Amino acid sequence: MDGVLWRVRTAALMAALLALAAWALVWASPSVEAQSNPYQRGPNPTRSALTADGPFSVATYTVSRLSVSGFGGGVIYYPTGTSLTFGGIAMSPGYTADASSLAWLGRRLASHGFVVLVINTNSRFDYPDSRASQLSAALNYLRTSSPSAVRARLDANRLAVAGHSMGGGGTLRIAEQNPSLKAAVPLTPWHTDKTFNTSVPVLIVGAEADTVAPVSQHAIPFYQNLPSTTPKVYVELDNASHFAPNSNNAAISVYTISWMKLWVDNDTRYRQFLCNVNDPALSDFRTNNRHCQ
């Protein structure tokens, strides 16, 4: 009788343990999925969350032009209060502008999990190809000479670029020159060259009412002439001017963060904001859908 009772109790205990293990596996599966991508940062994204500052606190460091070579200094925005590492982004302002013109976007990107250096150029009148060289120098500074607190947060193997106007033209040029970059985001870009042979994934932001770099002469030809094998997206801001990137802009925030997250962090959670887009804030949207596959 005691043997029968022991076997019954043992069977009941085993069944309970198996049920508990199954429950634990189901409960843990989202975490397991998240851990499969070592670069995934932050909670599951929503569109509204991408229009505001993200989950990370942000520290800043001012880079004196006297302490660097190859570019004119600038401001670094980087996540703090964490031991994680993050991809790096160098950003160039436009013609006659300085780093303050993109301060909002630099901080926004950092708050969502990037180390961002918004540069000042050697001269406010530098043309796009000079800005490309300065973006390259800025990335090298981030990797090798930035403060230890910054380098402790930087994953130097995951780098990207962005820029406004002539800085956007410089962004296209450096993307052509440096195929190791993970992503490029030219904002209302300007360049006399319309063809850039790059394999770096490119998101181009145009502005419908741009009279400085009209989209028909700049942003759209840039997009059209990128190789068909290159992941590419063109978004056109409805009724926006050339200077839309210089102030807080919800659409720029959503698409820039999403593009950087997808390609710098390999975070496919952000595809939802870049595929099958129907956005009233845009007057045009184009893509070859290579990022949606």
From Swiss-Prot:
Cystine crosslinks: 275-292
Localization terms from the record: Secreted
A GO term, aspect molecular function: acetylesterase activity
Top-rank taxon: Bacteria
Principal cellular location given in the protein's record: secreted
Catalytic activity: cutin + H2O = cutin monomers; (ethylene terephthalate)(n) + H2O = (ethylene terephthalate)(n-1) + 4-[(2-hydroxyethoxy)carbonyl]benzoate + H(+); 4-[(2-hydroxyethoxy)carbonyl]benzoate + H2O = terephthalate + ethylene glycol + H(+); an acetyl ester + H2O = an aliphatic alcohol + acetate + H(+)
SUPFAM superfamilies hit by this protein: alpha/beta-Hydrolases (SSF53474)
pH dependence: Optimum pH is 8.5 with pNP-butyrate as substrate. Shows 70% of the maximal activity at pH 7.0 and pH 9.5.
Temperature section of the record: Optimum temperature is 50 degrees Celsius with pNP-butanoate as substrate. Optimum temperature using PET as substrate is superior to 70 degrees Celsius. Shows 70% of the maximal activity at 30 and 70 degrees Celsius with pNP-butyrate as substrate. Has half-lives of 5 hours at 50 degrees Celsius, 80 minutes at 60 degrees Celsius, 40 minutes at 70 degrees Celsius and 7 minutes at 80 degrees Celsius. Is thermostable, with a determined melting temperature (Tm) of 84.7 degrees Celsius.
Similarity field: Belongs to the AB hydrolase superfamily.
Additional observations: The gene encoding this enzyme comes from a leaf-branch compost metagenome. The source organism remains to be identified. However, it is presumably a thermophilic bacterium.
Name listed for the protein in its UniProt record: Leaf-branch compost cutinase
